[in-house]
Amino acid sequence: MTAVDGTGAAGTSAAEALAERLFAATLGASELQSVYLGDRLGWYRALSDHGPLTSTELADRTGTVERYAREWREQQAVAGYVDVNSDADRRYSLPQAHADVLVDDENLLFLAPLARLFVATTSSMPRLLDAYRHGGGVTWESMGPDAREGQAVLNRPMYLHQLCQQFLPVVTDLHATLSDGGQVADLGMGEGWSSIALALGYPKIEVHGFDVDAASVNAARRNAHDRGVDDRVHFSLVDVAGQAPEAGRADAGTYDAVFAFECLHDVPDPVGFLSTARAIAQPGAPVIVMDERTADEFDPEAGPIEQLLYGFSLTCCLPDSLSHPGSIATGTVMRHSTLESYAKAAGFERVDVLPIEHEMFRFYRLG
């Protein structure tokens, strides 16, 4: 086992330990690429639904080339992702436990979309290098559907199966408000799964979602229609910060609750964004922000979650934010104190951490 500081087992030099760590990272990166292929080409789903399969059967079912399918399934067997029998034709299958992670897109363990996110950011490396050297950034839109869809489907199980079932009921007054019905705003909703989950969990509310990405808004409308809630869930292409009302109009708010799920750290103007949230909320209405569960302050020993967040910040969140002139450039690792400073600049008096437990996210109530 190689530690973060580069030290390894007894008798291993720091250089050897770091070399081992980079080799392990290379294996991990290679596996993510193979997971991307299996996800996007439908190979995992075919093995899950119809396995065991030979490479010819796998290729035929997915409309792919047998030679590539054969190489991929052998790599997957060597990596331990799929099982292979000992027969001469070597049929391969996907264990159910692995299907939970790689195929079942509503399972809380579904992590295949991580590969899409990494492929999206890796394909942006030439533009990232240019931005790092000369300034500017790389827009979320330019990272393509792998970034947009990967982010959306990665969070979907949590929204659909935990948000209204476990998380929001903890906030008793908010739960009561939503149960009674009313108007709800979902700012920066992406492909709309948070809005859809709110509507499914609280059948009396009407949800208005807002986002700056046209492709996300269009996808959100399709998703709401497919889930049968498009009569109560509506999406608009709006720059929330750019549309912030004057301070004097804050009391004219129309929403009984306002949410912002995992988007504030990406926003170029978080103070303007939160000013809008405050303005459109009715007096005393809850404004809820869900964002990354970061440490309270910078700590080199913060652990793997913070390592992952910094990785996303380097290649995705910070470059997207910096692609907008005048961006405050928060980055993925937005700490409690940073959010609090934005909220107070936007006119809020307090920021409370809600007693909702999640490994990746923290929920804040602004008031």
Predicted segment positions?
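Core SAM-dependent methyltransferase catalytic element
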Residues: 347-367
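Conserved adenosyl
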Residues: 122-272
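A short acidic, leucine-rich amphipathic alpha-helix
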Residues: 55-61
